[in-house]
């Protein structure tokens, strides 16, 4: 198969050695997409990826991890009839983005994982361009803030940058875009990290990177073009409350003072707040 023909179909830009690209693209990848009530967007996102895998015959799979009760499940199941590498798993109710991804990781067959959002805010060709970076790293984050023309809403960017400063100062994670929904990971590090993560809200991104760094994994960021989706769900109050409480609880959990925190207070967080 001519890799250049495949790349031309997906508008992929090559800046690396052709043989190296062939090697990594023919590895087994699991693309994991959490979907909470995404019936309006899931077809456009999935169609491009499914046709790419179908045309290239790469040994990749796609796992859609569904929460919610709209028509997403029916849409995915209908597409599964055409694309045998498309898989589906569903949780009970809304269990949080982190839990949705963990469910998919548990059943994934890949040697590498690609996490993507259902909104297609980062084009699939950007993901494909980043794939070779995983050869010499353990996590590749597709980072949104370095490219000036990326139009990120002020409130979202303000919260993200403030949260990032707190993460850097409290956990020592020197990453600019911890909350990017687009990541490429080596399977061994992802599984080992998820085995010890209990957070299920969007703070799972930070917990995942923290655990992988503790395991000795190498994390890099690759700036990409980002297109903000006007229908993207973002509640500034919920985000600040959820992320702030999660960061505080996570920091305390990994401090020498954890054993002195009353059990009732620990249980309150896990019962009430980790799904925010």
Task: State each model region's role.
Residues 1-29, 196-276:
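Hydrophobic helical membrane-anchoring modules
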Residues 14-18, 38-53:
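Short, well-formed alpha-helical segments that are part of the catalytic scaffolds
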Residues 27-33, 42, 49, 60-65:
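Hydrophobic targeting segments
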Residues 38-41, 68, 97, 123:
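Donor nucleotide-sugar binding loop of glycosyltransferases
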Residues 60, 73-107:
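Conserved donor nucleotide-binding strand/loop of the catalytic core
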Residues 66-74, 120:
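A conserved acidic beta->alpha catalytic loop
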Residues 91-107, 112, 124-202, 229-245:
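Acceptor/aglycone-binding surface of glycosyltransferases and processive sugar-polymer synthases
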């Amino acid at each position: 198969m001519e890799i250049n023909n495949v790349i031309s179909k997906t508008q992929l830009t090559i800046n690396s050695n052709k043989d190296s690209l062939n090697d990594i693209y023919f590895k087994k990848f699991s693309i994991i997409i959490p979907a909470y009530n995404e019936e309006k967007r899931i077809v456009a996102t999935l169609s491009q990826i499914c046709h790419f895998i179908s045309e290239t015959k790469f040994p990749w799979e796609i796992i859609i991890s569904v929460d919610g009760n709209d028509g997403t499940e029916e849409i995915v199941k209908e597409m599964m009839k055409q694309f045998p590498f498309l898989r589906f798993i569903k949780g009970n109710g809304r269990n949080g983005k982190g839990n949705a991804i963990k469910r998919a990781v548990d059943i994934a067959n890949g040697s590498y994982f690609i996490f993507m959002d259902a909104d297609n805010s980062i084009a699939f060709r950007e993901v494909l361009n980043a794939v070779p970076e995983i050869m010499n790293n353990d996590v590749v984050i597709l980072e949104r803030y370095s490219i000036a023309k990326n139009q990120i809403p002020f409130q979202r960017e303000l919260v993200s940058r403030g949260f990032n400063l707190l993460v850097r100062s409290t956990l020592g994670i020197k990453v600019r875009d911890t909350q990017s929904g687009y990541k490429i990971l080596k399977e061994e590090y992802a599984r080992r990290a998820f085995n010890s993560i209990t957070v299920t809200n969007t703070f799972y991104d930070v917990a995942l990177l923290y655990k992988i760094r503790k395991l000795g994994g190498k994390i890099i960021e690759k700036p990409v073009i980002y297109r903000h989706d006007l229908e993207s769900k973002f509640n500034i109050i919920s985000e600040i409350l959820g992320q702030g409480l999660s960061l505080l609880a996570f920091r305390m959990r990994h401090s020498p003072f954890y054993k002195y925190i009353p059990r009732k207070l620990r249980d309150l967080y896990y019962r009430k707040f980790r799904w925010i």
